[in-house]
């Protein structure tokens, strides 16, 4: 199977960003938006070779004349043609490798539909002719990256959030909570809040500007009501942001109202419980003997956990929910934006993992359903 000298590829396909690189590296080589853009208008420039589709950063930079689509929604692939374009772009343009020469480790959202997993496997073997592949759950990889095998991972990206309890390296599927509330919803909500202030953001291109505002200026308040009072009484919380056209907008309480949605989804009309509540419920669904280990190892991962103040707020909320004697530790590793990828890089380079790969021969013998037997 995988020879020691052939480097495996690790591809973490997120709803918002695709992270790709080589096993044994400590960071992904390529990080680009999971976007496919198509021209809104037919080309009129003679001699310009206009493509029918642009992927990633190129789509991002030409966003003014393109319609942008995300093929992965809520962590699950909804458009396979576009997804194939993203993988093609990953291998040939970003990493510049021939996929038929490298084993490929892919990641998936917990509770991913079975058919999706099979389709992923099929495309890898039949379209890209990879020699071997494996699919792993994102949250488990994040935990590996933090050097643990037991813990409760809150993984929140652009399209979906999950709380996943893991004991001795195994995810406990019955206790996984899935929350269709993540970075993209926060961006949409911030767009709406800014529109109320008289700044209009409507197009897919303008959404990217709002995402940038969100990433640069927002934070999680430790005490939301107190923070609202402070914001109303003075302007010390206000920050300004320069738009690409030179206009400057000022944002005040929007800075912490935006990520507050994670703790109070009712702000955007969702009936689900907040991330602190999901984490608590996940732990309560686990065996009473392992709860102590889970409470003591709550690991944050994904781009939407990058808000300043989220760790402290999480600790505060969980302390209020859990038994008073319980010691609660929320770990927010600095590299958590890429910890899924880093975990994949660690896993794919372990000598003990080499027999786990699904080989082309096994696939040819059993077909796509082999993925359920080998990857769990």
UniProtKB/Swiss-Prot annotation:
Name the EC number(s): 3.6.4.-
Give the UniProt subcellular location, in the record's own words.
Answer: Cytoplasm, Cytoskeleton
Name a Pfam family for this protein.
Actin
User: Which GO MF terms does the UniProt record name?
Assistant: ATP binding; hydrolase activity
Reaction(s) this enzyme catalyzes, per UniProt: ATP + H2O = ADP + phosphate + H(+)
Q: Does the UniProt entry include the keyword Mitochondrion?
A: no
Q: Cite the InterPro entries for this sequence.
A: Actin, Actin/actin-like_CS, Actin_CS, ATPase_NBD
Q: Which domain of life is it from?
A: Eukaryota
List the keywords (alphabetical).
ATP-binding, Cytoplasm, Cytoskeleton, Hydrolase, Nucleotide-binding
Record-level GO cellular component terms: cytoplasm; cytoskeleton
Q: Which SMART domains match?
A: ACTIN
Describe the family membership recorded for this protein in Swiss-Prot or TrEMBL: Belongs to the actin family.
Function noted in UniProt: Actins are highly conserved proteins that are involved in various types of cell motility and are ubiquitously expressed in all eukaryotic cells. Essential component of cell cytoskeleton; plays an important role in cytoplasmic streaming, cell shape determination, cell division, organelle movement and extension growth.
Report what the protein is called. Answer: Actin
